[in-house]
Amino acid sequence: MGITHELDIFVTNEDLALKNVELFKGNSYGCFINLKVKEEKKFNIIFVLKPDWSEVDKVKPIRMIVNNNSVDVEKVSESLYQVVYSASFSINSDSYVKVFSDNPDKYKHMYPTVTINVPKKKFKVVDQGNTYMFIQSPIDDCDKEQFLKNEFEYYDEENDFDDYEEYVKNRNDSFDDY
């Protein structure tokens, strides 16, 4: 039947999700990203790989090159269902990013290509390659909760309880008026 991994890439500081970046079939994953910037900008990227364990017993690590410079990609967590990686880098001019598990030149015609124009807040899939890739913005709340807890602060847990107590008190006070 063939190997079918799943790969999602989250560009957290731009609130973008590159979804279904995996190939239709095959033990390779990656994409090319054209980044347009007008000033220095730091990017934080989270990769979520859901391996097809029925066909492989270990996954290839994700690697990244930005403007011909290697970027450290750190494995954050690994479970039976997924492997999560993260990477950060800064650029001060338009840049070309390669994300890959195998030689990106070999898969150039298969990996998707995306353009993200940061100043204009525009993005598009330039070439879908052999994927069903799409871009989601903003990042879905379920994905934020599951993978990006440290990147997005939803609430302050200490204040949640206080706010709830205040809500109940106000609600009960309003019932007294009737």
From Swiss-Prot:
InterPro entries: Poxvirus_C7/F8A. GO terms for biological process: viral process. Pfam families: Pox_C7_F8A. Belongs to the poxviridae C7 protein family. Plays a role for multiplication of the virus in different cell types. This is Probable host range protein 2. It comes from Yaba-like disease virus (YLDV).
